Amino acid sequence: QRQMCIRDRDNGIGMTKEELEQNLGTIAHSGSLDFKKDNKDENIDIIGQFGVGFYSAFMVADKLTVISKAYGSDEAWQWESSGVDGYEMTPAQKDTVGTQVILHIKPDTDTEKYDNFLDEYGIVAIVKKYSDYVRYPIQMEREKSRQKPEPDPKPEDYKPEWETYTELETLNSMIPIWKKQKSEVTDEEYNSFYKDKFGDYADPARVIVSRTEGTANYNALLFVPSHRPYDFYTKDYEKGLALYASGVLIMEKCADLLPDYFSFVKGIVDSQDLSLNISREMLQKDSQLKLIHNALEKKIKNELHAMLNNDRAKYEEFWKEFGRQIKFGAYSDYGMHAELLRDLLLFWSAKEQKMVTLQEYVDKMPAEQKFIYFAAVSYTHLRAHETKA
């Protein structure tokens, strides 16, 4: 903090002088993309293919320093730039192979508090938010305290003493829960993840795991809440699923992944087919996103129908919370989605004195009955008329 710097180092293969100039000295050059093109026949999962992510550091830093030593080389090189007048290359001293990136953080202004990025807990929060599921460990030396060993023999007037020490701590989880097989995760683990991630106090009514390879490659972990949020039927409610690209968060709530009638669903989608710096405008036109949307729509519908058939009591509780949204979906857009949603609808049957589906009503119709009869009023009003009659 005193030096206003963030130092990030790896233990990779490093870069030569020529590679530093090519990869960092050329804006929008992507070594990752070149690597994928050179190995297009292999199944490679790699992020960062546009070459502009590195330069986003200038949003918080007024100078970047990169020191790298390539594998098999005896010399190290330093690349440095203020983001204005090119860059400078100089020989450097580095004992180990790999790369170190130093961000020289900007001084605070009246409108921006850049020193927040130097706070230890702030850095941990940023890593947990955006890179918790990157499959490689992100470690940081953290200052901690512990009690010193007690002397032996211990004096009568002994008072415990504490000392500070630093410990290398892995900040990210690395293995996303949604990439595990459902058989490898307990219900308690799913429930705990849901409540921690989405701030709910109750367990979800349904956990949906979806994994697809082919035209659309993605992993999804979805949750049907057991109760509706307090602001669900207000303009303040935001639908959407957390969208990740190869384990890196690119959007907290991607509304385009869910139709309005399933807006109550919460969850996460992780796809290898999306780039890290894709914009909201590009997402709306992205063909992969449309494929994922269609697949999730079908999956959610099937899971809700399975709940209806296999756990009727739980489905009726779900219907009390979100049935209005399903009915609105069947009615809206001139009934465009009625065919998809009709098997999920429940109605109160005056004769049966319980909730029934349309199919259940039809199955019990007398042979001579040709129509479904209904009263377009609330059950309370209907009971009032029955009493008068």
Enumerate the language-model features and the residues they cover.
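GHKL/Bergerat-fold ATPase module in large chromosome/replication-associated machines
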Residues: 46, 64-86, 106-116, 121-383, ...
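Conserved small/polar residues in nucleotide/adenosyl-binding loops
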Residues: 2-8, 380-387
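GHKL (Bergerat-fold) ATPase N-terminal catalytic module, capturing the glycine-rich phosphate-binding loop
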Residues: 1-3, 7-117, 125, 148
